Amino acid sequence: MCSWCWGYRPTWQRLQEKLKTTVEIQYLLGGLAPDSDVPMPDEMQTFLQQTWHKISQQLGTEFNFDFWSRCRPRRSTYPACRAVIIARKYGKEQAMYLAIQQAYYLQAKNPSDLDTLADLAAAIGLDKTLFKEQLTSRDIEQKLMDEITAARNLPIRGFPSLVLETDDRQLPVALDYHHWQTSYDNTISHLQNKTSDLL
């Protein structure tokens, strides 16, 4: 549920394709906002709508602005994060990421709602009843807390972010929303520097 992550998706997909034989790609969830039933303040709704317009203008990203009139926006992203962790257990992490993004940004559905997430889980082939049980389990909550802690310890300032982890270092990777080559070149440079350090 990160607007800029949605905008970055096409470039990220191309970058992943180029890097898949060079590095192992791992996703970390940043958490952002704990569970809440409190309606999102009007100022924040306005700010996020402006952000969507900005991303659309700069990157050509599609957004369905009906979300803001059809749904009851809440600042609550932990449920979506837990949904991804559950899907990961069954090898469907990427499918869940995409399902949540499409529901939120294109279909005007609210991924803060547990019923929405359960429907998405069923749509990607997960057992809906079991998913709903796991979504509120202590085990999944702890895994999310551990992942948020790990993300906060990375050399990043926000999302999306890329980090190259080698044996002894975590190196931030330059991110370019328009050109995958920028991040690719920076990653290769980091790897080459690591090799040089060993010589």
Predicted stretch roles:
Residues Y8-K18, V23, Q102-L199:
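C-terminal cap of thioredoxin/glutaredoxin-like
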Residues W4:
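Short, cysteine/histidine-rich loop/knuckle motifs that typically chelate Zn2+
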Residues R9-Y104:
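Structural alpha/beta surface segment adjacent to cysteine/selenocysteine redox centers
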